[in-house]
Curated annotation (Swiss-Prot):
Function: Catalyzes the strictly specific dephosphorylation of 2'-deoxyribonucleoside 5'-monophosphates.
The keyword Metal-binding is assigned to this record: yes
One cellular-component annotation, GO: cytoplasm
Protein name: 5'-deoxynucleotidase YPO2559
Organism classification: Bacteria, Pseudomonadati, Pseudomonadota, Gammaproteobacteria, Enterobacterales
Amino acid sequence: MSHFFAHLSRLKLINRWPLMRNVRTENVSEHSLQVAFVAHALAIIKNRKFNGNLNAERIALLAMYHDASEVITGDLPTPIKYHNPKIAHEYKKIEKVAQQKLIEMLPKELQHDFRCLLDEHYYSEEEKALVKQADALCAYLKCLEELSAGNNEFIQAKARLEKTLAIRQSPEMDYFMAVFVPSFSLSLDEISLDSLD
């Protein structure tokens, strides 16, 4: 018997942004799906508009599993995780142990297939960068949603993420930011108007 998927099912019980007041709580499971949507889109944009040659479906899978180890470690708040390089380095080691523990829950004949999704060492540098871009973009989108709902708790997080996005800047991310991001600050009525025309 394997407990792998029973563990992954519990990602929905782990809330993100645990130290901040949220208008709407976000869990790791739904965050992972949104990161998969965005990473997939970034890969397609890169391929279609900027001469990329990425496997968009693989990118979506990598993004889906990118926080899977948090079912064991929990979601450590960013200010703590990156407080200093030593803490960040040690936390990476903890994540690695958690990833290995998850992989060992699988039947032997499936372990390699999932190791390629759970362990960043199997990602190309380009795949890793794209998933990190999508992860940061989704955190930024969460900030926009919270701010548009009147929650000023996310002002500093938004400013920090804008710096992160500037560091991770790419043509495909610029395209995504210009074409898709503005809608996240609008109401349902506003985003529905264009759809009905």
